[in-house]
């Protein structure tokens, strides 16, 4: 990231332990280095064999696996499903440019080498209808295993934090994110209420009218001045702006 204003967002700060398996579509995306796999990003299971994550999480030179049904990373709980990713099954949005995170399109799809086994601890995320826009202050939750504070450790247990949505009208004001934020993004947080942000690539979970949860955002970036910077909410790729691309990519692969 060459931009002075942003960096990959990788923490839930001032969050809380999630209820185990409550965000049952949350995955850990891990890359291989020196014979071991390391957590790098979050993601959401949107089909039995497809995960959505952030474009900046993917490097085509790396080998990845996905862990589903995870809660406490330090314990083998028996619910985990570890699924390898084949090299040709990483689909980063064609307009993603790693030198311009503010340009948007920070989204990628990962095809699993086999289908997940769905159950109470591994479920599919619901996606919003195309074009759906959240109202200001919508009570969304971020989730992830990101760092607990800047430069700090990764937590063992999945964290969550309430991040109210900041609508485009507010988030694009000059003293907030200004022109950095685009209409294809969602802002949430930006004050001290909930602290910070979750793993890059992970979900912004928002309640739908029927009481279910929908993944409205893919965690993209935060302020370089730190996590819970006033008027610098966490910025997410707006999933409802990319429904067509998601559908087309899955259908053709």
From Swiss-Prot:
Residues 12-251 form the Peptidase S1 domain. GO terms for molecular function: serine-type endopeptidase activity. Its main location: secreted. GO terms for cellular component: extracellular space. Pancreas. Gene3D superfamilies: Trypsin-like serine proteases. Residues 1-11 form a propeptide. Pfam families: Trypsin (PF00089). Disulfide bonds join 41-57, 100-103, 140-206, 171-187, 196-227. The keyword rRNA-binding does not apply. Transmembrane segments: none annotated. One of its GO terms (biological process) is digestion. Keywords: Digestion, Disulfide bond, Secreted, Serine protease homolog. SMART domains: Tryp_SPc. It is found in: Secreted, Extracellular space. Monomer. The zymogen is secreted as a ternary complex composed of procarboxypeptidase A, chymotrypsinogen C and proproteinase E. May protect procarboxypeptidase A against denaturation in the acidic environment of the ruminant duodenum. PANTHER family: CHYMOTRYPSIN-LIKE ELASTASE FAMILY MEMBER (PTHR24257), CHYMOTRYPSIN-LIKE ELASTASE FAMILY MEMBER 3B (PTHR24257:SF22). Belongs to the peptidase S1 family. This is Proproteinase E. The lineage of its organism: Eukaryota, Metazoa, Chordata, Craniata, Vertebrata.
């Amino acid at each position: 990231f060459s931009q002075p204003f942003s960096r990959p967002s990788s923490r839930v700060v001032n969050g809380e332990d999630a209820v185990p398996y409550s965000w049952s579509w949350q995955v850990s995306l891990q890359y291989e280095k020196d014979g071991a796999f390391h957590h790098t990003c979050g993601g959401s299971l949107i089909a039995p064999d497809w995960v959505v994550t952030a474009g900046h999480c993917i490097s085509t030179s790396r080998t990845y696996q996905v862990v589903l049904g995870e809660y406490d990373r330090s314990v083998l709980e028996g619910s985990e499903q570890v699924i390898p990713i084949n090299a040709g099954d990483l689909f980063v949005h064609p307009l993603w440019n790693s030198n311009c995170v503010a340009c948007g399109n920070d989204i990628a799809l990962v095809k699993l080498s086999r289908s997940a086994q769905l159950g109470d601890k591994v479920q599919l995320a619901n996606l919003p209808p195309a074009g759906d826009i959240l109202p200001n202050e919508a009570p969304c939750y971020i989730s992830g295993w990101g760092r607990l504070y800047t430069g700090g450790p990764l937590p063992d247990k999945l964290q969550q934090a309430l991040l109210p949505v900041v609508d485009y009208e507010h988030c694009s004001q000059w003293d907030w994110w200004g022109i950095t934020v685009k209409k294809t993004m969602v802002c949430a947080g930006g004050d001290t209420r909930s602290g910070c942000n979750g793993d890059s690539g992970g979900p912004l979970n928002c309640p739908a009218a029927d009481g279910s949860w929908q993944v409205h955002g893919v965690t993209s970036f935060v302020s370089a001045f730190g996590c819970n910077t006033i008027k610098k909410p966490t910025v997410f790729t707006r999933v409802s702006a990319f429904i067509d691309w998601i559908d087309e990519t899955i259908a053709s692969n």
